[in-house]
Each structure stands twice: as structure tokens, then as C-alpha cells.
Amino acid sequence: LQRSKTAREAIKVMTTIANTYGYNSEGETFTICDPNEAWIMEMMGKGPGSKGVVWVALRIPDNAVCAHANQSRIGKFNMKDKKNVMYAKDVVSFARSKGWYQGKDADFSWKMAYAKPDFSGRRFCDARAWALLNHFYDMSPYLDWALGKDPNAKDMPLWVVPNKKVSVADVVACMRDHYEGTPLSVADGTDIGGGIWQM
């Protein structure tokens, strides 16, 4: 990142280095910011026998709050929006070559092709993103997704426009959240098999 002056440059540097030297990871999500822009990028190594990565990066709107927690969050994205979206040239074709996606480019969802959320991903990871976003936006329509039980539940938005100005104290409160006061709370001693997961 020291080689970059902007978030856009950092994305190009990171993906160029990973494509040149390889990247041994099942997938990572990065928040990359500069004084003017914030981006969320997801990147995955191509696996044994292949060097390089597939990746996608989306610019988070200036008026929005975004959250991610150990689970792929980027779904569908507008491949024509060059101002706010960057991606590997083979982001769709690589998924097709592996048999992970067969549809049209316009319907492609990164996370459904490369890291489809299962119960654990939703209940223990997306739930933490849900809790953070719930501080700034009514996330109740997406509770079933965060609970992880219904495979057809309404997916969460990647970001939300907050219902108030976000302060440093608000962010601190988010990081201390344990789902108190929500159906995700385990404060009553409910054993969900994983204990209390903190952000």
C-alpha cells in the first residue's frame, strides 16, 4: 500500500502483485480507503496449478456505511460502471470454467459463485455485519438472512445510508456489540454451538 497514493492505485498494485507472484488464499475481503474514497475489494487465488487471482472492487458511496466480517459480501455488480467498479477481466469466465456459474454476465454474483454463504457464514459472519449496520439502519427485513436458517431469505445490502450522522462513539459502540436486544443475542444462555461472537 505504500506504493499507492489513492485507494484506486492500491487496488491496482495489490491485484498486479497477486497476479504476478500468486496468491494462496481461499478468499479475502479488504476495505481500502484514502481521504476521498472508500472501496470494498474481494480477492481469491485461482488454486492449485494456476497463478493469479480473480477479484472485484466496489466504491462505497460517500453517504453510506459498509460492513464485512469473514464472509464474502459482494453480490451482483454493474460491470459497465467503470467509475465505481473494478474487476478482473476473467471474473466471470473463471467461475464458468470451474462450473461455478453458468448464467449471463449481467446476473453474475461474486459471492454466489466464489463463496456461497452457508449457515455458518451467515450466522457467525454476516450476522456481525448485520449488527453493525443495524446501528444505523433498520435491518429487521434481513434478520432471517443473518440467522442463517432460511436459504431463501432476503439477502442483506452491501451498504446502507445511515439514519444519523456517524460519530467515533458510534463506531466504538458497534465494535462492542454482542447482538444485545436482538433475536441474535445469546445473553439468555442459548447455546447456538459457537458461543458469543464479537465483532
Regions found by a protein language model. Give the residues of each.
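Short acidic, glycine/serine/threonine-rich loops at helix termini
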Residues: 42-45
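C-terminus-biased signal that marks the final domain/tail of proteins
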Residues: 9-15, 22, 26-28, 34-38, ...
